[in-house]
Design a protein with these regions (language model features):
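Short glycine/serine- and acidic-residue-enriched loop/turn motifs that recur at repeat junctions
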Residues: 31-51, 87-108, 141-166, 198-217, ...
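Blade-level signature of beta-propeller repeat domains, shared across WD40, Kelch, NHL, RCC1
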Residues: 381-394
Length: 394
């Protein structure tokens, strides 16, 4: 583990520290914390231990962490565009052309997915989507609800088995710029700005197609929303959010604990109050978002204090409420009932559920207002069910 030494001046250590002499880690190192069930921390051990502070995963060329919320499996991209996966792979979701048919197969250290031009990836419980630098969209894992977009829920060949899984990546036609996943469902934005969804549509119409329950096993356009969709985020509990190029924020799907502004299920997109939204991330029944002015907002369920308002009101909040008064927030990334926030100086903060040490603050106590995580600057972060990951910038 390489260390560098330097002398810092006032303001160079995060956004808020003092002058002094410090050490920082080599660029692009990868760190993990939380529950190691099924080797989910990528530490080359399968023991189900809890790690409550960041611990390094081998390698120094990591670039991007998968978005979404995987259940005991995770993925990340290296600087050379290679894609890696680890953890539980019983549905073929680790892309190794092996494993469908159960939940016992796992890799406790990262294994490479074929290809070297991966640009972004989003994971769900048992499947994932990935976009390459040429805008191709690929997918792998469980196809139980048609979430792999192959026009069937059970497609023979190419690694598929009777449990509907693909154990090696398969392409979804079209040119794509962004992607999102949920339980047995998938979403994508094409290069023309149109929004598409496919997979299971049960529990509130989470596909956004103005249908209550009809599932779709191939990409279907969400009509009425125009051609100006910019970015996607998913919420684990059957809901979805997306931001348009005009800075408006839209949600739809199942409502729990006021996670939708109407407090009722919505099978088509409905606008969230406010403008100038920059980024949104959701999980289970809560949402967190940043605006272009650097402010941080949250709404939805709050039973673990995950909204960051220094309380644990279980009744939830139905519209966005600002977290604190700072204007230097740059990104949000949700895990299950928790969220990570980065500042413009790439300091890392976390809030919410922490029973497995997944916040990384050397504790297992829940946190109801943002707490600083680790040292150094972080270029990316990701949260799963009970595990979390980060890439150090220095």
């Amino acid at each position: 583990m390489a260390l560098r030494n330097n002398t810092w001046t006032l303001g160079e250590w995060y956004d808020q520290t003092v002058a002094g002499t410090g050490s920082y880690y080599e660029d692009n190192t990868f760190w993990a914390w939380g529950d190691n069930q099924a080797g989910a921390l990528g530490q080359n051990q399968a023991t189900s231990v809890k790690v409550s502070s960041p611990t390094q995963v081998p390698g120094t060329t990591w670039s991007k962490i998968a978005t979404g919320t995987g259940y005991n499996f995770h993925m990340a991209i290296k600087t050379n565009g290679s894609l890696w996966a680890w953890g539980q792979g019983g549905y073929g979701n680790l892309g190794q052309n092996a494993g469908p048919g159960g939940g016992t197969l796992y890799y406790s250290s990262p294994v490479q997915i074929p290809g070297t031009t991966w640009n972004k990836v989003c994971i769900s419980q048992r499947h994932w989507l990935g976009i390459k630098t040429n805008a191709e969209l690929w997918t792998c894992g469980s196809n139980q609800g048609g979430e792999l977009g192959q026009n069937k829920a059970d497609v023979p060949g190419q690694g598929d088995t009777t449990d509907n899984s693909y154990s090696s990546p398969i392409q979804i036609p079209g040119s794509w710029t962004d992607l999102g996943t949920g339980t047995n469902r998938s979403y994508g934005i094409k290069t023309d700005g149109t929004l598409w969804s496919w997979g299971s549509n049960s529990n509130g119409g989470p596909l956004g197609l103005n249908e209550a329950s009809t599932s779709h096993s191939s990409p279907t356009q969400i009509h009425g929303g125009g051609t100006n969709w910019a970015s996607l985020s998913t919420s684990h509990e059957k809901a979805m959010a997306a931001i348009k190029t005009d800075g408006t924020l839209w949600t739809w799907g199942r409502t729990t604990n006021y996670n939708l502004p109407s407090n009722s299920d919505r099978s088509s997109p409905i606008q969230v109050p406010g403008t100038n939204w920059a980024q949104v991330s959701g999980s289970y029944n809560s949402w967190w978002a940043t605006k272009t002015d650097g402010t941080l907002w949250s709404w939805g369920g709050n039973d673990d204090g995950q909204l960051g308002h220094n309380n644990q009101n279980p009744s939830g909040i139905s519209s966005p409420v600002q977290i604190g008064s700072n204007t230097n927030w740059s990104s949000v990334r949700a895990g299950l009932k928790m969220c990570f926030f980065r500042t413009t100086g790439n300091a890392l903060f976390a809030v919410g559920q922490n029973t497995n040490g997944q916040l990384g603050n050397n504790s297992i106590d829940k946190v109801s207002s943002p707490v600083l995580i680790g040292t150094g600057a972080w270029s990316d972060v990701g949260g799963g069910y009970y595990t979390s990951f980060g890439i150090r910038q220095w």
